[in-house]
């Protein structure tokens, strides 16, 4: 008889047929065509597989339904049935022997053939039972498998039985007894045929097993291969549990199965895919620490796929929007005015997950900021006065001073004894078309883009990115260092109400400029510069000019919403004053402005003054100890001798003086202009600054511009007085040579400063220094403005670097009282 291979697939087909035949009512025929993960091995680690399945069934703790009981139940039933069948065969054999004892040993061919068939059936049945009993329980019980292999007592009993049968056959062969002789002849013939048949079947089964294994490797279906399934029995799966993958065969034998190598969560080693090939029918994994428990379950796969799809549905549109947003922002290579690029290195090592969900994508989320340099990017939702502290450090140092002539920040500035020498940051946090014409040049007159309101309305969703780039790049830390180096000691910083809040219908970019305002103050602190806060845009517009945010009607204290906007403006000051009343600002924010240039020539003077007193009391009640600045409203300064004689303490009057918006002054020649400043303005400022006048007075705005030629200075699309294009109905030129000629032109005034003649530079510096001298008879001055894109005569920075401004503001070359220098051959028409 052929040796019994340990390959489980060798008799798999007959095992299935045997089960069908023996248990026709209990076998589930719908699962005969099983898909197997098979490797033809001769030395499976069946103990391991037994452990896997046994642990799994003990863990699950369930009962099997009829027809699908555990293998051990099959074994007990098989043994009983086999015993009954053997009894039938023995009884039949005894009857046959009794019948044959009285007959001739030579029987007819028909009888011999029938006996041979019976003998063949009996031998085949015995052989099937031997293999069936062996195969069914080899996986389920490792000890029984070892006995079958001959290593245990059971194996020795099997060998003794085999030897006993062979001995009995030999005795029959040697006996002359007719019964024995007949039996022997039949058994030998049957065994010879059976041997030949089995060898053929073995070859067919091996070929079949090889083909089946090859086909199965292609399918790679995720089916569990447990003991019963390997022999054609359907393995019961507990309800609501998915099958685990159990690998067997050569992979397991070589230690390459998942139980042998599986990277756990937090464990080391290569990824699962690198350890376990996806070929050969593999389609999953097993957790080696809990054999039989699935790592990937079918339901989890479906849920996972659904989650991935959902994430893609969310992420792709967001990525498109973010990509569009970043296209509107400069990339990492965009240079700032000083040639540097925006720095976001302080985000390194931090996670966007540190930002709460409610703050993601808002002005509180530093991952949405264009520039995080010198901001504290640690998240906080803390507020003071309802205004965010996000971006601020918790410590500060007030020991700096801008120069030796000025006390450090932690020492009081001697207002009234030492003049303010400062500069404005106009056109930065509150746009002004002539300072940054690039925002407006690309639009036609028909577009109606004339101010920040219409600009942000036109920009729509891209306004935030566009303006934040401007906030981050137009004024940088280097500017504050330069302001200090220029000998200046104060900075007047403009902001508008939308830095604090916005209202329904507002297109303005809300709150972003607030962060840059706070950073600017910290830069001022670093370089010892004191700050004057100045709200340029008030709800409703206080003057109807473009730098108030919206050009047109005045809606503050005036018109249908005048009272509403009055209330709103006080609410803004309530918040802002509470914020800047913090100790950290007491030494650096030393002047607190109420409103820039309220047009009291159009507004009720009484209404403006009443609001001014109420606002002053409000902010002082909230803790502001700084000087409170109010603008003169374009009233004649002499009138302020009798205005607000009884007022709150610590108030300053702010006046803005220009020679180019007055048609009687713009026509003066160069020398006459300097004389006007030193003779008239100086006396005017000195008078209003006295106790007989209003009292402490500063000049919050002035420039060295001697023409109104700067682009958009007189509003977007408006001409100039200098060239006679200001009015659509009047072409009169207002310039020194208007009557005598030649005709005045803006070409020279708007030329690049490098083209300025030495005489023109000399005039511009003398003109500037004369104004400094005049305004220092009061509390001091703030030049308008520090930087422009193209209007050189309005940029202190350009003039300082271009050589037509004193290198140190506190050390001018000219003072009122000095002889006005000769400007040589400088033409009067520019």
Swiss-Prot record:
Catalytic activity, reaction form: Successive hydrolysis of beta-D-glucose units from the non-reducing ends of (1->3)-beta-D-glucans, releasing alpha-glucose
Active site: 597, 701
Compositional bias segments (type: Polar residues): 330-348
Residues in the Cytoplasmic compartment per record: 1-301
GO terms under biological process: cell wall organization; glucan catabolic process
Chain intervals for the UniProt region annotation (Disordered): 1-279, 327-351
Annotated localization: Cell membrane
Superkingdom of this protein's organism: Eukaryota
Compositional bias annotation for Basic and acidic residues: 1-34, 52-98, 110-175, 198-215, 228-243, 253-264
Membrane topology label: Single-pass type II membrane protein
Compositional bias segments (type: Low complexity): 181-194
InterPro entries: Glyco_hydro_5 (IPR001547), Glycoside_hydrolase_SF (IPR017853), Glycosyl_hydrolase_5 (IPR050386)
GO molecular function annotations of the record: glucan exo-1,3-beta-glucosidase activity
Biological function: Glucosidase involved in the degradation of cellulosic biomass. Active on lichenan.
Protein name: Probable glucan 1,3-beta-glucosidase D
């Amino acid at each position: 008889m052929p040796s019994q291979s340990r390959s489980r697939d060798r008799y798999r087909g007959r095992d299935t047929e045997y089960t069908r035949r023996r248990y026709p009512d209990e076998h589930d025929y719908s699962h005969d065509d099983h898909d197997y993960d098979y490797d033809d091995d001769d030395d499976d680690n069946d103990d391991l597989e037994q452990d896997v399945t046994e642990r799994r069934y003990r863990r699950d703790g369930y009962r099997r339904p009829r027809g699908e009981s555990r293998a051990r139940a099959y074994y007990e039933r098989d043994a009983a049935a086999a015993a009954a069948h053997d009894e039938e065969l023995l009884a039949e054999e005894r009857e046959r022997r009794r019948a044959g004892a009285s007959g001739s040993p030579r029987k007819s061919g028909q009888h011999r053939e029938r006996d041979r068939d019976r003998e063949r059936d009996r031998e085949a049945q015995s052989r099937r039972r031997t293999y069936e009993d062996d195969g069914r329980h080899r996986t389920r019980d490792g000890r029984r498998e070892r006995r079958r292999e001959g290593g245990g007592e059971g194996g020795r009993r099997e060998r003794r039985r085999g030897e006993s049968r062979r001995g009995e056959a030999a005795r029959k062969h040697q006996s002359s007894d007719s019964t024995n002789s007949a039996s022997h002849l039949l058994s030998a013939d049957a065994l010879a045929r059976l041997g030949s048949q089995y060898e053929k079947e073995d070859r067919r089964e091996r070929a079949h097993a090889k083909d089946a294994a090859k086909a199965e490797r292609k399918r790679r279906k995720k089916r569990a291969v447990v003991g019963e399934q390997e022999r054609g029995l359907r393995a019961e799966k507990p309800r609501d549990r998915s099958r685990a993958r159990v690998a067997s065969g050569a992979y397991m034998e070589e230690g390459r199965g998942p139980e042998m190598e599986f990277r756990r969560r937090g464990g080391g080693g290569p990824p699962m895919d690198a350890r376990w090939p996806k070929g050969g029918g593999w389609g999953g994994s097993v957790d080696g620490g809990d054999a039989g428990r699935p790592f990937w379950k079918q339901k989890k796969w479906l849920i996972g796929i659904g989650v991935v799809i959902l994430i893609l549905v969310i992420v792709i549109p967001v990525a498109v929007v973010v990509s569009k947003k970043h296209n509107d922002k400069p990339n990492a290579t965009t240079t700032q005015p000083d040639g540097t690029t925006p720095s976001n290195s302080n985000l390194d090592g931090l996670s966007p997950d540190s930002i709460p969900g409610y703050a993601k994508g808002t002005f509180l989320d530093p991952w949405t900021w264009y520039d995080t340099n010198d901001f504290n990017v640690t998240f906080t939702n803390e507020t003071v006065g309802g205004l965010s502290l996000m971006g601020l450090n918790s410590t500060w140092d007030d020991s700096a001073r801008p120069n030796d002539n000025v006390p450090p920040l932690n020492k009081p500035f001697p207002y009234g004894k030492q003049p303010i020498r400062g500069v404005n940051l106009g056109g930065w946090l509150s746009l002004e078309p002539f300072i940054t014409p690039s925002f407006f040049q690309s639009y036609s007159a028909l577009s109606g883009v004339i101010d920040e309101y219409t600009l942000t309305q036109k920009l729509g969703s891209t306004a935030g990115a566009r303006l934040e780039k401007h906030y981050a790049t137009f004024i940088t830390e280097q500017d504050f260092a330069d302001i200090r180096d220029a000998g200046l000691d104060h900075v007047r910083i403009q902001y508008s109400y939308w830095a604090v809040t916005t209202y329904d219908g507002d297109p303005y970019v809300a709150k972003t400029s607030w962060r840059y305002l706070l950073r600017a103050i910290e830069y001022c602190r670093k370089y010892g510069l004191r700050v004057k806060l100045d709200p340029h845009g008030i709800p409703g517009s206080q003057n109807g000019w473009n730098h108030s945010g919206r050009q047109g009607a005045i809606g503050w204290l005036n018109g249908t919403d005048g009272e509403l906007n009055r209330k709103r403006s006080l609410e803004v000051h309530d918040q802002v004053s509470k914020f800047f009343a913090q100790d950290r600002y007491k030494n650096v924010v030393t002047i607190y402005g109420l409103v820039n240039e309220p047009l009291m020539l159009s507004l009720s003077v009484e209404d403006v003054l009443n609001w001014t007193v109420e606002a002053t009391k409000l902010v002082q009640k909230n803790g502001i100890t700084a000087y409170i600045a109010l603008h003169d409203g374009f009233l004649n300064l002499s009138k302020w001798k009798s205005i607000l004689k009884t007022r709150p303490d610590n108030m300053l009057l702010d006046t803005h003086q220009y020679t180019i918006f007055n048609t009687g002054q713009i026509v003066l020649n160069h020398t006459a202009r300097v004389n006007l400043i030193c003779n008239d303005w100086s006396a005017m400022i000195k008078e209003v600054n006295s106790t007989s006048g209003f009292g402490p007075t500063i000049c919050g705005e002035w420039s060295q511009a001697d023409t109104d030629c700067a682009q958009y200075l007189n509003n977007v699309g408006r001409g100039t007085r200098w060239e006679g294009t200001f009015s659509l109905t009047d072409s009169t030129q207002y310039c020194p040579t208007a009557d005598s000629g030649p005709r005045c032109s803006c070409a020279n005034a708007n030329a690049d400063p490098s083209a300025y003649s030495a005489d023109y530079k000399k005039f511009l510096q003398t003109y500037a220094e004369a104004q400094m001298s005049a305004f220092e008879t009061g509390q001091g001055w703030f030049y308008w403005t520090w930087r422009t894109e193209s209007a050189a005569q309005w940029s202190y920075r350009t003039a300082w670097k271009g050589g037509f401004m004193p290198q140190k503001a506190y050390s001018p070359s000219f003072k009122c009282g000095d002889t006005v220098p000769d400007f040589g051959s400088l033409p009067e028409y520019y």
